């Protein structure tokens, strides 16, 4: 059932709807307040039940269902917008790739307030990344040439002893797994 107000005056209750036709099944991870994954595996056209969130300012990463690739990042300034005690709906809308969709509107997150009116666009934030360089310095003959993987995705093939990769971007503040296998 739809809500017009939060179940607690200190919270903002948020209903989430996935309405972006070219976006994959996604997770939403909150990265500023440490809330972690708040929406898990939501496909296009589905709703996630109400999230009863303490009214605060959040930073939301939209990730693929595996949680490894960040598609976009948005601010959700619930406290700044003084939304305590309210219930609202956040919709993912638009296209991740507008060029493949007749130049349609770009992907974004929008808030429908209980009072109605024009949807409120959540601000896009820069995706946090870290610069990583891989250096092969293992003198073991069995590891003279190796393949390097980042989160189960091939990163470097045929990587030789005493070589260094160029710097690459990796998710900042995230745990990731680096795998090494014989080439």
Task: Name each model-derived stretch.
Residues 1-183:
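Intrinsically disordered, low-complexity polar regions and short flexible loop motifs
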